[in-house]
């Protein structure tokens, strides 16, 4: 039997994802950049259900408006019932890549009409795992992207990037090549061009798949620990704070997740593993140290987590 073509392989992947996660959904959106991954996904999605393409113009390149309009025209030609271009402002805070990602996801969330299909591939997952590992960002980063994290859907997370490129070729589509993807100033671009090929050569291949398997295993373990922390949190509460004595009786991975959930519920944002461990030290290595500062969801202020009379407490202070 002949091996299925690239487009058929993608269609099978999207259909399987839809059956597993989106059975009752009548329509969906696709985040379309014009690149080969999202373009191939759009082609498949539009053949399966009524599809709205959402194109986010970050305005980071001189021809970004033209690229967005080309993507819109391609979406309509591929059978999308609608296609809209959303222009966003990228503030650059936290680095250009991170700022663009925040702006993109905010725009998609605000303008979506149903679940949002994203064109992330197995290669993207491997890159994400390596970035998280290199930055010491904790288990959540190394666990990579979830296939289904409503409203975000990643039906191609098990497919290699080469398959989406081949699917575009089968359809005769000319995909946009984002210059940022080959710009060595960006860490992900260097991982893609230099680090992963070297690892594949040194380790004899299969590295991308191995990294993705590792992400899946870590994600499953992490979800179990999150569930244990959710059960433990009510017993540790002391009003708006947390009882140190109750926290001290928990296993370290569960305790840190209880602390994380408490911080997030209190309005913390952008939490790092270092910050969570700093708050954890207020429980396990208490010597009268000061509070731990964390980001706040409200502009113009910071949150502080400290210990007082055997209780962890949160308070806000204006940014000066």
From Swiss-Prot:
Swiss-Prot/TrEMBL GO biological process terms: tRNA modification
Entry keywords, A to Z: ATP-binding, Cytoplasm, Ligase, Nucleotide-binding, tRNA processing
GO MF term set: ATP binding; tRNA(Ile)-lysidine synthase activity
Location(s) in or outside the cell: Cytoplasm
UniProt entry tagged with the keyword ATP-binding: yes
Binding site for ATP: 33-38
Enzymatic class: ligase
Keyword ATP-binding: yes
InterPro entries (UniProt xref): Rossmann-like_a/b/a_fold, TilS/TtcA_N, tRNA_Ile_lys_synt, tRNA_Ile_lys_synt_N, tRNA_Ile_lys_synt_subst-bd
GO CC annotations on file: cytoplasm
Catalytic activity: cytidine(34) in tRNA(Ile2) + L-lysine + ATP = lysidine(34) in tRNA(Ile2) + AMP + diphosphate + H(+)
EC identifiers of the protein: 6.3.4.19
Family matches, as Gene3D superfamilies: 1.20.59.20, HUPs
Domain statement: The N-terminal region contains the highly conserved SGGXDS motif, predicted to be a P-loop motif involved in ATP binding.
Function summary: Ligates lysine onto the cytidine present at position 34 of the AUA codon-specific tRNA(Ile) that contains the anticodon CAU, in an ATP-dependent manner. Cytidine is converted to lysidine, thus changing the amino acid specificity of the tRNA from methionine to isoleucine.
NCBIfam families: lysidine_TilS_N (TIGR02432)
Family: Belongs to the tRNA(Ile)-lysidine synthase family.
Name the record gives this protein: tRNA(Ile)-lysidine synthase
Gene (name only): tilS
